Amino acid sequence: MEQPHKRKRKSHELSNSQPSDREPATSTSANAREGDFMEGAIVRITMHNFLTYDHSEVFPGPKLNMIVGANGTGKSSIVCAICLGLAGKTSVLGRGDKVGLYVKRGCQRGSVEIELYRTRGNLIVTREIQVENNQSTWMLNKKHASQKAVEEAVRELHIQVGNLCQFLPQEKVGEFAKMSNSELLEATEKSVGPPEMYEFHCELKTFRTKERDLENVCKEKGNFLEKARQRNERNKLDVERYYMKKRHLDRIQMLEKKKPWVEYETARKELEGVKKERDEMKRKLRFLKEAQEPLLRKIRSVESELQPIEQQMKEMTNRIKEATQKCKQKHDQLELKNKEVDDIKQDMSLKQTEEADRQKRIGHTQLMIRDLQKELQNMGTIEDVTPQIEAINAELRNIQEERARLESESLDLRRDKDEITGEFARLQNRLRSLDDMMKIKEEKLRSRFRDTYTALEWLRKNRDRYEGVVHEPMMLVINVRDARHAKYIETHISVNDLRAFVFQRQDDNDKFMNEMRDTQRLRVNSIIAPTESCSKRPPSRPIETLKPYGFISYLREMFDAPEEVMSYLCHQYRVNDVPIGTEKTKGMIESVIKDLQLRTIYTAEERYNVKKSAYSNNVVSSNSALRPPQFLTTTIDVEERRQLEEQLRAAERQKQSIDQRMAAIREQQANLDRRDNELRANKKKLSDLKSKKRQLEQKISTKQDSLRQMEQNEINLVAIEEEANAKIAAVNNKKVTIMGEYLSHLQSKARLNMEKVYLALQSAGLSAEKTKLETDVRESSAELKRAEVDYTKLDKIKTNLLMTCKTLMKRASEICNMTPGETAVPEELHAAFSLLPETLDEIDAMLNEERTRAECFTGLSDAVVDEYNRREQEIKNLEKELDDKTNELTTYRRNIAEAKERWLNPLKKLVELINVRFSDFFQSMQCAGEVDLHSENEEEYDKYGIRIQVQFRRNTRMHELTPHHQSGGERSVTTMLYLMSLQELNRCPFRVVDEINQGMDPVNERRVFDIVVRAACGVNTSQYFFITPKLLQNLQYAEQMTILCVHNGPQMLPPNKWNEKAFIQRARRRNRT
């Protein structure tokens, strides 16, 4: 399982094998079969203080050597010894990069000695490794030698430990499938081809490069030759025009000699004028600077007076702010007191209004009583309608009771409906919350594994294509019950499985993977759940027995998953038997490992893997820190979601039932209302006749009672007014005190403001004076700056003119070949100069005219005739060089054709032989495979390569071997069968393959083993080392095989005490029982 983080290694009672006093028994048989060894095969390997060994000797057989042993016993140490002992690089092994790391821990030096078979006498190669300086000492046949000499001796025996076709260590098994076609071809040439095949290949690549260089040289020389011929044809006319041009050039030369003298005189006159202007400007500049200095002194004086005033103003402003704040506080207090007085007055006003209203109601009530008494005196006798009213009252009571019952029931139903509606909304919100959490998990999948997310979207749209159950990637369907436990699950389950789809049926899985990999070109993972469910598999022991050690649960109990997913995890990762511990567990980890003998243990922050040797009681454990969780931190309770959906359906049914019952109640209430209205109308007619007198009597009695009550509730306004006036007086006293403090602060503020105004006036006067002075300074500064700019310009012009005069004088002297220090025009030039123009314009005009005429004769010089003759000779030389290069190119092409024939024809035959054996091997496994020589361009020899194509299932097409398309087991099978295809063709003395059967299923592993035995134990085959930690039962073995069992540990019996007869007798007794 892939672990991206480093692991710490921790050993418990682990010891290496003890040094033996004599050679093992296998050495006798090995020496007896020495005649079967091929040239360069390994006869003996001796290791001293090397990796896990104190001292060990290995005597392999001449054919197939099966090196078998439990993990950690030292099988790969033998592979490392072969590589390093034969001058291999540490990079070949893919382990430590320093050779000193291969010495046993605690030792300062170690050694490896390898004896190689040779017909003229065996070769013994010894390498002693020093840890301190990470250096090695080499010996050949017990004599000191250099590493280069050892490498040469190994090369002579055709041993190539850096060739993956010959030497394939455990850490490099995966790199075989990553080799490019060109790399695989070169490795195959070195491994099984004749010695000259790889040399021919290298020559062809070199020849092709040189051929292209020669083609370019011939093309360039041909082009150059043609141009030279054309150019020389034009030179014939140039020779004739040469003398015509020479006359114009002489006149140009004389004009160019006079021109500098005219330029010098012009520049000298201009320089004199500029000097005068500059001196005048210098005097003006000095005057302006002297006039500006008094103004600057005055400005500094004003600034020194202004600074303390501004500081006082800042302090005054702060004090004014403090006084203002205090005034505001007192003002707010006065406002509060005013509001308090208003509240007291308002309360008193309310009492007065209430008393006036009471008096008014008393008068109104007395008037109503007199009116009612008068009406009662005027009434006559009324007929008795009591029986009819009582009958109506009885029916009305029944209706009222029924209405009350229906209303109560309706209220209960509405209450129930409101509760159900609220619960329904709560359930919907919770369900949406769970859906949002699932979207978060899907977003993590999309951002990390884009191909898997694309496949998920496709599956959701096409799920009906599959007959069995198909589960989405594990990270979506696994729900951790507590987010704090996600780190255990993500550490225990590989990321590749977390993003894998889980299928119930094999045919559904094949159909899905064909669609994803072949059609959509997506890199996805899939898993097939076990046929028999393992999800309910019980742990090996109850968790209660582990609680004394700090364990709280098994890993399976910390998350939920669908049946098929949980079944796979129990089967593959044994989550039902992996306990989770705490800090208490970590504190007693030694006892936990020793007493419980668990394979995998988790503490609060670490994971422990424990292995026990199959041959002793030794225990080896390794611990690593837990990975921070990335995918499962978002928890979704699946059971809660199911219950929510069920509760939503039940709530919907209850709402419908309540709505139906409420509709029936409304219908009954409507009927009762109609009957009630009819009865009340009848009763009203009867009651109006009977109860009018009684109503009048009751009204009079009621009004009289109300009148007495109002008369008793008299309000004492005088007491209330006295109490209110007392409260107002107390508040006013407090207001007077506050007002005094307010006026004091206000006066202080006013005084401070006045002081600030005085300071501001002083500051304004000084600032105005400073501004006026600064304005005057700016005006004078502007004029001064302009004067400085003008002076600088004039000084620069004067300097430039002076340099120009010197340059022109120097130039004129050089042109006229005058001696240094001479400033007058030579006498011999006066006559010639007198015939030429006197001004620059006239000289330039004549120069342009003469140059124009001379330019008509382009490409002419004094050596034009010599150039013509020289080019004629050059053309002859180029023709000869072109002929030589053309002949050389023809020879190269002939050599390339011969080398290609010598290389390509044997290579094609070799690849065809490999393909025949490779195809036969795959056919014997009921699969298909082929090997061919592939090249896009036959002339590009560095692009040739060997292409491997395989087909493991009948319903798929053949695919090229790549690191991504095939599974790890399929790549291992292909690698092994390709190496077996080279076995009989190989000219190398031995081949090493380390644990290549890891990841193979049992059927393929058995088939590959049979092929290895047949191929490696044949006639004229090289020595073969096959390292594996396990073997299947009932395998077919051959007499030519040598099985080397690797044991290790402190409880082992030393080899000098072995009794072979006792071993055999014990094995026979065991077989009989």
Curated annotation (Swiss-Prot):
Keywords: ATP-binding, Chromosome, Coiled coil, Nucleotide-binding, Nucleus, Telomere. Residues 264-340, 389-444, 641-723, 861-902 form a coiled coil. Residues 1-33, 684-705 are annotated as: Disordered. It holds the Pfam family AAA_23. Residues 435-635 are annotated as: Flexible hinge. Residues 14-31 have a biased composition (Polar residues). The flexible hinge domain, which separates the large intramolecular coiled coil regions, allows the heterotypic interaction with the corresponding domain of smc6, forming a V-shaped heterodimer. This is Structural maintenance of chromosomes protein 5. It comes from Danio rerio (Zebrafish). The gene is smc5.
